[in-house]
Amino acid sequence: MERHRFQWQLLDELLDGRDRSQLSLLHFAPEPCLEVRLRPQFGTYLSADLFRTNVDRQVDVQNMPMADNSFDVILCSMVLHYVEDFEAGLREINRVLKPGGLAMLPVPMIHQNTCHTPAADSVLNMVVEPGPDFYEAYQVFFDEVRVHRSTDYDDSLHFYLEQTDEHPFPMRLAHQKYADTIPVSRKALDVNSD
């Protein structure tokens, strides 16, 4: 899928020159096509999900049983809009992320502006229906947030989504063609460490 290829390309760029065998990665709701490639590359690879049983650990992103500063990289794609308290999830991701670590935390862009629902939507089961402004909440929890866009890449890489229905998603580029975004959040290096 285009989204997975975009994530792979971006992660490859962000970790260029780093020895992945010395890095730890926490992967929420792991996509099989990424897991099979990432697991052998990282010194520590931990897959996690609240409901799935084919993961290393069943974990609630809002309350993780991991020590502070445990992971160099966290992938949590298309998850936070389902989380009852997504801000608690962001806080926890920041807590377990090592200083200098990065987290890729994309969500789907459903509306022009984020809609908060009082209860999970009965059809989509979403607590939040994100818009481009959703990523502004990340700035409260991380020292740096940069939104990478598929439109920043050569069109031949095909890092855009194709939708067959006519839903007016906010990232529309052309008929049935939609841009994708991946926010990369970073935790600052600990300036007090030796």
Residue positions per predicted region:
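S-adenosyl-L-methionine-dependent methyltransferase catalytic module, highlighting the catalytic core
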Residues: 84-94, 98, 102-194
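Conserved N-terminal segment of class I S-adenosyl-L-methionine
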Residues: 1-65, 178-194
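An acidic- and aromatic-residue-enriched active-site/binding cleft used to recognize and process polar
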Residues: 50, 76, 108-110
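A short SAM/SAH-binding and catalytic strip from SAM-dependent methyltransferases
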Residues: 72-84
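A short acidic, Gly/Pro-enriched loop at the edge of an enzyme's catalytic core
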Residues: 61-74, 91
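Short intrinsically disordered, low-complexity coil segments enriched in acidic
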Residues: 1-7, 77, 95-98
